[in-house]
């Protein structure tokens, strides 16, 4: 891997939450809402147990059924290790107590003392395999979005788009080539959303690999096209958006 790539990702990974936060706005107020939301960037290991519980409940409510029916399956322990990993970073949107708190970024506490989370994105700075025709190296620098979840009560307010915009902003600030993510094919609403945000199926996505290269298990279809069986049957896509 070229030393320049390694240096860029290492610099980004070493950036503190405070440093990363300087690139983000303090608050977000949706056009169709009177509620303002604080924007907090927190490393996975630094999340309080209360916030971890809140984030997990939101993730489980949104994704358990989809995951159980997929090849990825439902594995809470493995997923929690991924979420709270030392390289994980969270961008949290949390309701402010009142408009007067707007500049202070104080998030409203839930009725049981737990911090309310309207939406979150979890990402890492990383290297990923790159098969772009205009890219010579085998890997490139990316912001990989592992999760983007919005609470049901906060949907249709533009929060998903806002979070994607923040990931793109951070990717550009730290000179990452792409923002990338994995999306289940059955999650058609998410696929449509990311398409609207300018994402496309990446060349390393299983469906693209199936079109480009045969495997030992594959062969020719009736119309003479090669087929990579394992990849073609995969139930997810890898999406990306170029930012550099």
Describe each PLM feature range.
Residues 195-205:
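Conserved acetyl-CoA-binding loop of GNAT-fold acetyltransferases
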Residues 227-244:
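C-terminal helix/juxtamembrane-tail motif
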Residues 10, 45-52, 56-153, 164, ...:
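Acetyl-CoA-dependent GNAT
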Residues 172-182:
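Conserved GNAT acetyl-CoA-binding A-motif
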Residues 207-231:
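Short proline/glycine-enriched turn/loop segments at secondary-structure junctions
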Residues 1-53:
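Conserved N-terminal entry element of GNAT/NAT acetyltransferase domains
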Residues 151-165, 174, 185-192, 196:
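Conserved glycine-rich acetyl-CoA-binding loop
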Residues 181-191, 207-216:
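Conserved beta-strand-loop-alpha-helix junction that forms the acyl-donor binding cleft
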């Amino acid at each position: 891997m070229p030393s320049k790539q390694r240096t860029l990702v290492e610099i980004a990974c070493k950036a503190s939450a405070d440093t990363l936060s300087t690139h983000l706005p303090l608050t977000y107020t949706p056009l169709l809402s009177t509620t303002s939301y604080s924007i907090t960037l927190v490393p996975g290991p630094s999340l309080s147990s209360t916030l971890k519980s809140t984030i997990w409940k939101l993730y489980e409510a949104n994704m358990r059924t989809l995951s159980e029916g997929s090849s990825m399956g439902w594995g809470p322990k493995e997923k929690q290790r991924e979420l709270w990993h030392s390289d994980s970073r969270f961008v949290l949107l949390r309701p402010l107590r009142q408009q007067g708190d707007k500049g202070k970024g104080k998030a409203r506490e839930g009725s049981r003392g737990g911090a309310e989370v309207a939406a979150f994105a979890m990402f890492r700075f990383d290297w990923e395999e790159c098969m772009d025709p205009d890219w010579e190296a085998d890997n490139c620098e990316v912001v990989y979005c592992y999760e983007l979840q919005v609470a049901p009560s906060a949907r249709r307010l533009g929060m998903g788009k806002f979070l994607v915009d923040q990931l793109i902003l951070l990717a550009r600030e730290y000179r990452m080539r792409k923002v990338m993510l994995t999306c289940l094919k059955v999650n058609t609403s998410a696929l449509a959303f990311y398409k609207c945000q300018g994402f496309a199926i990446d060349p390393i996505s299983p469906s693209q690999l199936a079109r480009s290269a045969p495997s030992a298990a594959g062969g020719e279809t009736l119309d003479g096209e090669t087929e990579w069986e394992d990849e073609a049957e995969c139930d997810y896509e890898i999406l990306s958006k170029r930012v550099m």
